[in-house]
Amino acid sequence: MKVLKAWTLVLGVMLSWVMAMPAHAVQEVAGVKFQDSLVLGGQPLQLNGAGLRRMMILKVYALGLYVPRRDASPSAIMNQPGPKSIQIVLLRDVDAGRLTDALVGDVEANSSDAEMLALRGRLDAMASNLRKSGDAVEGSVVRIDYVPNQGTTISNNGKVVVHDVPGEDFYRALLRIWLGEHPADKSLKKQLLGLDN
């Protein structure tokens, strides 16, 4: 009987310990799971929001936005110091040329003439590298990461295709694709801001 009581006590302690452990929350979008946090450049980042990019009735990709501090303001997110990460999981095959043209077009639509003058050389170099990287297939994970004093890196399934583009202004320009005044998808913008999850 004493042994049974001892085991009951041990199991009770273990159960309370397990329940006290922090849960790793996951947000799911179209079957894609985004972790609640990640580490980039040695700094923890939080999932600000995740959502679905649609074109007409087609599901194109799921996207998660990771920042140092959650916020519902696009300008506050873009101006937060520290690393940031955009994670895109493709839900269909995407032609490299069309994807690149869409990204460049969305940057242009959300940037002033003066901003484009400063961005053009870096944007053209990024576009050239993206086109050379080949088509992205369904299930591919594209990461667009920014680390201060290092720059913007774009990878496809862990393979770097755009390496260390300098300037935080460049990453802000990419963020404006989804968070700018003329976002690629208004519904996705709300989801990334945590306003429609």
Please name every model-derived segment.
Residues M1-A6:
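Positively charged n-region of N-terminal signal peptides that target proteins for export
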Residues T8-V18:
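Bacterial N-terminal signal peptides
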Residues M19-A25:
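Sec/Tat signal peptide C-region and signal peptidase I cleavage site
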Residues A25-Q80:
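N-terminal secretory signal peptides
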Residues D71-N149:
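Mid-length scaffold segments of soluble, non-membrane domains
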Residues S155-V160:
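Short strand-turn-strand beta-turns centered on an Asx-Gly dipeptide
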Residues H163-L188:
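Flexible glycine-rich active-site/ligand-binding loops centered on an Asp-His dyad
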Residues K186-N197:
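Cysteine/selenocysteine-centered motifs that mediate thiol-based redox chemistry or coordinate metal-sulfur cofactors
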